[in-house]
Amino acid sequence: MDTTVAAMLELGAQTDRIRVAIGPTIQQASYEVGPDFRETFLAESPDSAALFIPGRDDRYQFDLPGYCRQRLDRLGVHSIHDTGLDTCALEETYFSNRRRNHRGEPDYGRNASVIMLSL
């Protein structure tokens, strides 16, 4: 995100005119991570603690869209819409590599993203 926003600014964009849509993407309820993953984020910024809630055993649930919002906010981008759509949970609608790995399924899908610049 940092590199993308920087490139946009170099092309003449202004942070107050940048609009961001997050998602569909994996949501916190589906994104289980280990303590080492959490520690990496906490070492970068103590504010990252808010992105993790306790999961089962020593695991945590990570808020990826929240992380994106946090990073964008630090970059001065504040117009952010999060779809709230969970690619892992909505299996009839979206492919999820995490879901596929957990189930041992063959690789069968992809998602695409679009970035539009209008100066």
Language-model-derived ranges and their functions:
Residues 1-119:
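Active-site microenvironment for binding and transforming phosphate-containing groups
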